[in-house]
Amino acid sequence: MIQRYDHPVQSGCSMRIIGHRGARGEAPENTLGGFQYIQNLGIRAVEFDVRQLKDDALIIMHDDDFVRTSGQQKNLYECSREELDAYNHAVNWSEWNKVEATPLLDQTLSLIQNFEHIEVEVKAVKTQAEAEKITLALEQQLKGFEHSAVITSFDPKIHQALRSRHSQFKRG
């Protein structure tokens, strides 16, 4: 269980606790409720995953479908933002008393605007054109978060797109 931690590890040193996918294992992952949960604990660092829907909306989601988190078989790349409320990511959390829809990136950024560290993992895409499109949209939405956001990806196409645009964001 994650607990509030306000004290340095040793004199002169401190530890940064980063909420992986929000509070994965403690709250429905990659949800506004999960991000609020870590914020309530005093955690001000988070990692989450970003994907782009067919209508170009950027969403927070690790998997490319809704099966594991909502129990519904649907490829997210076939969805538009209007369909997101149909997928409750808290369905497997009997003690969680709130519906957790798939959040848009801009909703998430509004909630975590006071965080010190925001690690945005861009999931793999099929083509360089898709990489260019998602990174352009991502950089536009992350404006104002240059001091706290780091864009990460295991996909070399994403890194190439960021390099070619001379991105000002830290990368990993």
Residue ranges, per PLM feature:
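Phosphate-group recognition and catalysis centered on beta-loop-alpha active-site segments
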Residues: 1-172
